[in-house]
Amino acid sequence: MELTRRNFVQAAAATAVAASAACTATAVADEAAPAASYSGTDYVDAAAEGKQPTIIDYTNVVEEVGAPDVVEAHDLVVIGAGGTGLAAGIQAFEDGLDVVVLEKKGLAGGTFPGSEGMFAVGSHWQKEAGVEIDVEEIIGRLMTYHHYVPDPELYRTFFNKTAETIDWLEQEGVGFQEVIALGESDPTWHLYAGERSKGLGAQFMVSFIARAEELGLDIRFETPAKQLITDESGAVTGVLAVDSEGKVIEFDAKAVIIGTGGYANNMNMMKQLAEVDPTKICAAGSNGRDGDGIRMARHAGAIMAPAPGTAAWYGPILYGTTYGTPVQVATSLQPVLWVNEHCERFVAEDMFFRNFPCAGMAHKSQKTVYTMLSQKFLDMYEADGVQLQVGVYCEKGIPLTTLKADLQDLIDEGNEHIWVADSVAELAEKAGLDADKLVATVDAYNEMCANGKDTQFDKADEFMIAIDEGPYYLFEVQNGYFCTVGGIKISTKCEALNENRDVIPGLYLGGMDAGGFYGDAYDAGIAAGSCASWAINSGRLAEEAAREFIGK
């Protein structure tokens, strides 16, 4: 594909749209992926046919390709043109390396356009705002939060890079607008510049891609990497890829950096590693995160880091809706009533705002989750806006003027996960739930609302509003997640490690392909924006280490 400024900017805009795919019970795998064992569709296909899928290690399956039709030689090959890959590629180009970036899609950006801001400590934005954060103190809190799964030295390496990376991004043409807290976090979340309604991450990526085009960075679109090449010693010496014409290209290289975005869309890997029912989960962002990089690294001898199944869960999303849209925010994430398959509450319903990974983890512990509200809440949200803000997508005080029309469209389209009734008992019966149990739960909840105190889960008093007048609405919701954060075990230099914990020479990983950065949950309540920040910073850290290894 010819690379022009127009293509780059169109690519970023298209990526923003792609990041808005709605979730359904069946659309949980990358439909564009080949129907083979490495595609991530096996589990869903087998389940649809009432069969058990073959039990194999999906982290170590790669596609075989034939002999190369073309051979090229470069200093560095970067796999993936998302946040991590572009950061590594741009940095490498500026450092004088002969670098090529391989991207399996026809556009750059990956799922990064779905982000809104990134974590940093010690930035000039924080200094100008009078924000002081002790690096060692926050590392201690994170290590405790993650049960000492991560490597504290990896944290130090990352944290000490974040402020300089903010400066670097601004020099590259990427802007920021402010640094704020997210829920209970410290003010570490650096929001990207731009109009919030147009997607801050998309605007970040438009600028970043434009910089890559300005430099003349060599990005090969529609050229997916298939396998790593290793020598007799186990060192990685290149990549086998296939271009859009089906030609096998051997990219010989002195080092390879992998940044393919994790495995959020690979339902085989989600089932194996996260131990979830793929029909009850929903990945936010664009498709294509099929675990390519992890699988290639595993095939080359790398091991998975502890907590390989960790994902950035955030909690409820109504089937058939898109994260951050008015109908999703109003029906799924507001502090109304959340119950499980037994019609029991299981968490304070304002947890999404307080610490959204905890909302997602609580959801993950249930078999099925429903949110419930009444007409007065829909009227309130449409007239006055939501009770809880969701990132920069739906802000408090801004009326959701199309909410009821959007919801009615879903009902008219036959969404089977929405029920409406004039009584709580009838609502339960329509949904196939125990009517007596749901009535008892609602009555107990309304009594707490009347007393102004949630004595069960300590939800904030201001959100204790009774659900006592019909029509009543019940929504079956999936558990949403932004990305997976479990991956390959790496050193503090982002080097891949083998089963002996020795470095695999020439192989580096960043972003969501690199593991060992999280425990069993995302840490937005402490380090808001750490995923996006890790994507960019690890790309640069991997490039630095690879450049040192190459000797340039």
Task: Kindly give the residue locations of the regions a language model identified.
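Conserved N-terminal/central alpha/beta ligand/cofactor-binding core
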Residues: 11-13, 34-58, 63-65, 98, ...
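N-terminal secretory signal peptides and thylakoid transit peptides that target proteins
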Residues: 1-16
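Glycine-rich loop(s) and the adjacent beta-strand/alpha-helix scaffold that form part
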Residues: 251, 255-318, 528, 532-541
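A glycine-rich dinucleotide-binding beta-alpha-beta segment and adjacent secondary-structure elements
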Residues: 437-521, 525
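Beta1/beta-strand and adjacent pyrophosphate-binding region of the FAD-binding site
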Residues: 68-82
